[in-house]
Structure formats: structure tokens, C-alpha cells
Amino acid sequence: MLYHRIEDWDDAYANGVNIPRGERWPDAWVEPSQSFRASLEAQDRARFDLSYGSAPRNRFDLFMPEGAPRGLVVFVHGGFWLRLDKSFWSHLAAGSLAHGYAVAMLAYTL
């Protein structure tokens, strides 16, 4: 069995540096996410910053499908415990919503 010794855990989770032009993606997601959030809020199908714990970032956004949900998808965003938050990823809930699932997008303490 091969074991890898990790000496710098911050570096181990900094996967963005391993993606060519990876730094451009967070900015590219801002507008689609904001538009998606505004659209669902206008339809009364979104609730923002609901609490699931006592820490300041223990919040989630809940997006509801049209009609009764078939279930719940819980999305824990990437960011590798280093940066970003739930608001960058909201538009990724569209597929689950289109198939009738509610989506909870979690933020967490970095």
C-alpha cells in the first residue's frame, strides 16, 4: 500500500491551483448565481440564510421546485475549506429543481 505524507494541509486542499485558469471560475459564477437566486426569490421558491447551527456561517439557502418536492438534495459547496460560500453555486441547483427536488445549499465555517 502506498501512503502519501501530507506536510502542508492548506496546500493539499488548494485544488484551484491545479486547474488551468482555475482562478477565473468564481467570478464567472457570480452573475448566473445572482440571476438564479433573484428569479427563484421572485417566484417565492427561495429562502436565504436559514440557520442550522450557532456559528456565523452555519447557514443554508433553500430552493424549492414547482409543486411538492420529491426529496431534498443537500449541496455542500467546493472551496476546499479555504474560500467562497454558498452564494457562488446557487445556479447549480437548477437541474435538481427541474426534476422535482428541493435543494439546500450549505455554507460552513472555513
What does each model-identified segment do?
Residues 80, 108-110:
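Alpha/beta-hydrolase active-site loop signature
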Residues 3-68:
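N-terminal cap/lid segment of alpha/beta-hydrolase-fold proteins
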Residues 87-106:
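Short amphipathic alpha-helix adjacent to the substrate-entry channel of hydrolases
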Residues 69-79:
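Short beta-strand element of the alpha/beta-hydrolase
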Residues 83:
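Conserved HGGG/HGGXW glycine-rich cap/lid loop of the alpha/beta-hydrolase fold
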